[in-house]
UniProtKB/Swiss-Prot annotation:
Gene3D superfamilies from the UniProt entry: Amino acid/polyamine transporter I
An example Gene Ontology biological process: nitric oxide production involved in inflammatory response
Residues in compartment: Cytoplasmic: 1-38, 88-104, 185-192, 270-289, 361-385, 431-489, 545-554, 603-657
Domain of life of the source: Eukaryota
Native source species: Rattus norvegicus
Record: glycosylation sites: N157, N227, N239
General function of this protein: Functions as a permease involved in the transport of the cationic amino acids (L-arginine, L-lysine, L-ornithine and L-homoarginine). The affinity for its substrates differs between isoforms created by alternative splicing. May play a role in classical or alternative activation of macrophages via its role in arginine transport.
Protein name: Cationic amino acid transporter 2
One Pfam family hit: AA_permease_2
Compartments where located: Cell membrane
PANTHER family noted in UniProt: CATIONIC AMINO ACID TRANSPORTER 2, INNER MEMBRANE TRANSPORTER YGJI-RELATED
Keywords, comma-separated and alphabetical: Amino-acid transport, Cell membrane, Glycoprotein, Membrane, Phosphoprotein, Transmembrane, Transmembrane helix, Transport
Length: 657
């Protein structure tokens, strides 16, 4: 029988949180050289990929019609909710790691590893698939001569593998890995160059669309669509309308517009790469929130403008789903414009490839530095770039692009991204209701005065909540809480956030797989629906009643807890829509990850071992001993509260390499 002490120790290992210290925030082995404009270009380039040249036509024809502009608006609002949560964490914890780090400092090590492991999968598949798409687009410009050559001499007839090995994609990935290894500043310049060309091409598309467009294409009558369907000998839909809908601005109704918004949501994925630059940007507390919000705004304007121009130039039912813009320009008599579109598409793929490749080594670097992955991945070059993680990421992505058919794996990207979005939103909720405490003491400054001021700063709030610390949960403390957050209220919020995620998952499953029963007004489905809705509302209102921490940072999510809760709802609902095969593949990937974590990561985690940083060797032994004594004293007095809390950054970093 396993002793209870061993079980308790093992459980504590799984939920231990990363302690972020002042000295670790100030110090970084990476080069602080990126500006706010670099972050905006990185976010726009990563998010505004080749999908802008394809997605609008596909969604407009099948789901939304001209109301695709509304679909993009809804999708943008849902994405901004996730973006705001990332922005607050970027302001609070400006360290490399993105959602992995945010989860680590808030809900513990196991969830952090799951998040980081899923992000690795998402970025690897994203990099490999974009590299193959770049290769395929370039091959199209050469009349598919490259593909025909490799199909003739290197054809592969194996299940799960690609039709032929893509040598061009391999060279592309390795070239990009070399560029990123050389330095982040040089990579940023390349990204800004291609992003600028992409934006110029999209501006050309918008202007051309509004010049050659016809508002009548947004007002097509239902009778006209029926005549077209009849002439093409196409059967009508179930409700007697044309297969192209009922015409007008919303030919498929508002449900079609919402369905289009669910697809368009993925068009805004990519801004999270900005959050991985925390140790490479000047003044990250301001630059990261501005970069995330501005890049999402620019991307929305681009998607909105291109989709409006496209549906004005050409009736939505005639749009080509694979190459909508070239066909639309042919339709209005501007055939040569397709070459401009091709150039923009290649530039968009280039920035999207860099946007997928850029955050991958930084996630590997952050996890390796914390001891959860192999330590060699945390090596940094003389140019202050995570060279080992970058080259490892490049080799893995190149092998994937070289051999595998990635179409079946692309949906797995969505799980990792949506799970990260959900966890970051949940972490914001948990974080904002924690008691505010000072940082863990820096190790090598004469800190006694700072420690005393830290104690004085928290003594007032501690004295005000002393009476509540020992009390158990009660209806009075539940609905009439104290004015300041306590450990009790923080624990309550943490439990309620987990319960809310469970309720939202149940609600999403019911509305996805029981929608027919709800439509038939079956009693069991209506009862379950009402139960989920009432409980969700009660949980959110209870969280809203709890006291928030009053300390301020450069950016904070507004409308708590409603905005993060809605973000969790959107993300979990979209996760439920994924196929069973995708979840099976995801489970296999997670089994592999757990093998690595329980065999290596849990034993080598820095949070469970003494910190052996290189710079400690240069510190005076007397200062180290004094700092160690002060740190151990503080841990003895306040260990549990420090683990529950998270530091709040109140200063700016402008250091540069």
């Amino acid at each position: 029988m396993i002793p209870c002490r061993a079980v308790l120790t093992f459980t504590r290992c799984l939920i231990r949180r990363k302690i972020v210290t002042l000295d670790s925030l100030e110090d970084s082995k990476l080069c602080r050289c990126l500006t706010t404009m670099d972050l905006i270009a990185l976010g726009v380039g990563s998010t505004l990929g080749a999908g802008v040249y394809v997605l609008a036509g596909e969604v407009a024809k099948a789901d939304s019609g001209p109301s695709i502009v509304v679909s993009f608006l809804i999708a943008a609002l849902a994405s901004v909710m996730a973006g705001l949560c990332y922005a607050e964490f970027g302001a609070r914890v400006p360290k490399t790691g993105s959602a992995y780090l945010y989860t680590y400092v808030t809900v513990g090590e196991l969830w952090a590893f799951i998040t980081g492991w899923n992000l690795i999968l998402s970025y690897v598949i994203g990099t490999s698939s974009v590299a193959r798409a770049w290769s395929g687009t370039f091959d199209e410009l050469l009349n598919k001569q490259i593909g025909q050559f490799f199909k003739t001499y290197f054809k592969m007839n194996y299940t799960g593998l690609a039709e032929y090995p893509d040598f061009f994609a391999v060279c592309l990935v390795l070239l990009l890995a070399g560029l990123l290894s050389f330095g982040v500043k040089e990579s940023a310049w390349v990204n800004k160059f291609f992003t600028a060309i992409n934006i110029l091409v999209l501006l050309f598309v918008m202007v051309a669309g509004f010049v050659k467009g016809n508002v009548a294409n947004w007002k097509i009558s239902e009778e006209f669509l029926k005549n077209i369907s009849a002439s093409a000998r196409e059967p009508p839909s179930e409700n007697g309308t044309s297969i192209y809908g009922a015409g007008g601005f919303m030919p498929y109704g508002f449900t079609g517009t919402l369905a289009g918004a669910a697809t368009c949501f993925y068009a805004f994925v990519g801004f999270d790469c900005i959050a991985t630059t925390g140790e490479e940007v000047r003044n990250p507390q301001k630059a990261i929130p501005i970069g995330i919000v501005t890049s999402l705004l620019v991307c929305f304007m681009a998607y909105f403008g291109v989709s409006a121009a496209l549906t004005l130039m050409m009736p939505y039912y005639l749009l080509d789903e694979k190459s909508p813009l070239p066909v639309a320009f042919e339709y209005v008599g501007w055939g040569p414009a397709k070459y401009v579109v091709a150039a923009g598409s290649l530039c968009a793929l280039s920035t999207s490839l860099l946007g997928s490749m850029f955050p991958l080594p930084r996630i590997l670097f952050a996890m390796a530095r914390d001891g959860l992955l192999f330590r060699f991945l945390a090596r940094v070059s003389k140019r202050q770039s995570p060279v080992a993680a970058t080259m490892t990421a490049g080799v893995i992505s190149a092998v994937m692009a070289f051999l595998f058919d990635l179409k079946a794996l692309v949906d797995m990207m969505s799980i990792g991204t949506l799970m990260a979005y959900s966890l970051v939103a949940a972490c914001v909720l948990i974080l904002r209701y924690q008691p505010g405490l000072c940082y863990e003491q820096p190790k090598y400054t004469p800190e006694k005065d700072i420690l005393e001021s830290c104690t004085n700063a928290t003594s007032k709030s501690e004295s005000q909540v002393t009476m509540l610390q020992g009390q158990g949960f009660s209806l009075r403390t539940l609905f009439n809480p104290s004015a300041l957050p306590t450990r009790q209220s923080a624990s309550l919020v943490s439990f309620l956030v987990g319960f809310l995620a469970f309720l939202i998952a149940g609600l999403s499953i019911l509305t996805t797989y029981g929608v027919q029963a709800i439509a038939r007004l079956e009693a069991w489905s209506l009862a379950l629906l009402a139960l989920f809705l009432v409980l969700c509302a009660a949980v959110i209102l209870t969280i809203w009643r709890q006291p928030q921490n009053q300390q301020k940072v450069a950016f904070m999510v507004p409308f708590l807890p409603f905005l993060p809760a809605f973000s969790i709802l959107v993300n979990i609902y979209l996760m439920v829509q994924l196929s069973a095969d995708t979840w099976v593949r995801f489970s296999i990937w997670m089994v592999l990850g757990f093998l690595i974590y329980f065999a290596y990561g849990i034993r080598h985690s820095l949070e469970g071992n003494p910190r052996d940083e290189e710079e400690d060797e240069d510190v005076c032994p007397d200062n180290v001993n004094a700092a160690a004594e002060e740190k151990s004293a503080m841990q003895a007095n306040d260990h549990h509260q420090r683990n529950l809390s998270l530091p709040f950054i109140l200063h700016e970093k402008t250091s540069e390499c």
